Every structure is written in C-alpha cells, then in structure tokens.
C-alpha cells in the first residue's frame, strides 16, 4: 500500500487528493489525504543508505553534470541542486551559495570533470576540472546575434564553430577514437580565437548596449576557452549539461501539481531524496513500483557500481 501511494504522489506527481481517489479506484481501499501526504516523508526516511551510496559512487565518476533550479517552499525561494551521471542522481536542497552547493556531499573535493553552466557558485570547486555547457553558450550567442546580426557576426561564427566541433567530437567517439586529431584541435582553437578577436574588435569602440553586451560575451569566451572547449579536448566530456537539466525538470512538474509551492522546507527536502532514488532506479532500468516496493519491504535498492556491467 505504501509503495503504490508513493508511486502516485512521488513518481507520477499527483496531488494528494487525486492520489487518494486513484488508490481507492484501483485497490478498493480508501486512504486519507493525510496518509498520501505523509508517504513521501516515510519513503525519504528510509533512503539514508541509498543517498550515502549514490554520493559515494558519484564521487568516483570521471564526469559529473551539475545544475540547480528554483523551487518555492514555505513562502520563500529555495533551490534544488543536482549532481548526476547517466546512471546516478543525487538531489538536495538549499539556497544558491557555495555552501549550499557543497552541502550535497558530492562536489567538495571531487577531482573529475564537472559539466555545468556559467554560474559562479561552482568556481570554488578548485580540485575539479570544469566544462561549460555548450547549449548555454549557444543560447547566449544566439540571443546576441538575433538583436544585431550585422554587428555581431562573430557570435554566429562562434556558434558555427561549437556546432561543428561537437559534430567532430561525436563522430570521433562513435569511431572509438580516444581524441580528436592535432589538426582538428588546431583548427578549432584557431577558429575560436579568430571569432573572439573579431567580437572584441567589432564592439570595443561602440557605445550601444548591444555592443557592450557583445564585448562582455566575447571577453567571457576569451577568458574561458579551455572550459568551453573541454568537450573537444576531452572526449569523455559531453557537449551539454542536459543530463542535469533533465534531472531537475521534474521539480517544475511537481511544483505545478502542488499549487505552485511546497508547504514546508522538509517537504521539499523529502522530495529531493525520493526523486534521487526514483531517477537512479529508472536509469538502471528498474521499474519505479518495484523500487518502491523493495524500499518499503526489505530496504532500498542500491546501485552496485558507477554504471551497470
């Protein structure tokens, strides 16, 4: 009964009243909205061993994807943070400070590569190698070029480079190559530096706001070349942080079905824990109901390694 209730409100994001009606319709057993509201907390309370295991394995992974998304709880704005791979997910809650990022217990001291957006809150993680999400870079470039296509030709050139370089990296991985060729990397770096130089020269003597924005973006690309091109220089690193963005997308779904917010901070924290479990189980091909049934009977399912096999 607990597993089916958790499936309704945790895996399918149903409001508690609708979940109670669904339980009655499918099982013939009437349960209260209070029972449905409390099942997520009961599940979260059993998931300590899982969260410990997930954090341990994530810290062993060579590449992690990180992101954060806003969530309203207890009348205020908070954040759900994620650290994940293709097979593991760990979510936690807090504000947007570096202390809150560290509180997830995965990123502090991590020595692999973190693929992320350009948010400065991750910069203190000095033990890790950093890679910027290519999708974010493309959105920034497209937004600039859209408003001034004649004056921001460099942005189009840079976007074309990133798209082309990603195709080269994808093809190299598919062919089993360990890296791009020196010739390819030289071409990528030369194209990159040329686009940056044009962005600076075309904007530095203009006074319009779009020119200031263009200069700022060109200088950002100049200062973060290694992070932006990490996907090309290290083929184990993905082009985007979409894995992390997909992992936090259910936060928005749950928020919509919860009247726009969580009533308590503990409720939001419980959500993050249970969603970590369900997301990881799904990535391993385990049915959500099976994972929840095991949780409420013999204890949580635990991933055996960083990846299956």
Predicted stretch roles:
Residues 1-309:
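Catalytic center-proximal scaffold of phosphoryl-transfer enzymes
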